[in-house]
Amino acid sequence: MDVTRLLLATLLVFLCFFTAYSHLPPEEKLRDDRSLRSNSSVNLLDFPSVSIVALNKKSKQISRKEAEKKRSSKKEASMKKVARPRTPLSAPCVATRDSCKPPAPACCDPCASCQCRFFRSACSCRVLSLNC
């Protein structure tokens, strides 16, 4: 009985090892130094050289000015969008296609009615007849 358990445990370990080894990508299956040299994907000659350039004061000032212009243009654009006032509703009512759960007031449109679905969990004001 102990021999069969030992044999099954050894078989299980080998199966786990071979399963993990079979899922490795081909680049990671290196056998010797020659294959390591031939399969190396990192070549230092392939990368371009990096040069570091110091910025002078004039270029810094130009970039700051450009940044300030961009900021001011963004602020002006946002101010234009905000400037439109919304028309306030005259009475406390629910607009068409908005949520109108039972504690909410009635629908604003006289032709609309509150329709509920999914056991009154999703309610909205809808126009039922076009001839109203």
Swiss-Prot record:
Q: Name one GO cellular component term.
A: extracellular space
Record's Gene3D superfamilies?
A: Agouti domain (4.10.760.10)
Span of the signal peptide: 1-22
- Protein name per Swiss-Prot or TrEMBL: Agouti-signaling protein
Q: Which organism is this entry from?
A: Papio anubis
Q: Where in the cell is it found?
A: Secreted
UniProt KW Ligase keyword: no
One Pfam family from the record: Agouti
The ranges of region (Disordered) come to 62-88
